[in-house]
Design a protein with these regions (language model features):
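Catalytic phosphate/metal-binding cores of nucleic-acid and nucleotide-processing enzymes, i.e., regions
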Residues: 1-66
Length: 66
């Protein structure tokens, strides 16, 4: 995935699942997109559990963000 384009929800899912490689910033952006769009709560259960863990750890923000 090129850094010059906006990350799509598809890209975010692929990065979260490890199909696409991503650095720490890209992983954080991917999970934030999944939370912000609500996909984290409508995909397989582990997405929601991981999103909750990342929110509780302060890695990403809950939606809506301040």
């Amino acid at each position: 995935m090129k850094d010059t384009k906006k990350m799509t929800t598809f890209d975010a899912v692929m990065i979260a699942e490890g199909v696409y490689p991503g650095d720490t910033d890209q992983m954080q952006e991917a999970w934030q997109i999944l939370v912000d769009t609500g996909l984290a709560w409508s995909l397989q259960g582990w997405f929601g559990r991981e999103a909750t863990r990342l929110i509780e750890a302060g890695v990403i923000q809950p939606f809506p963000r301040p």
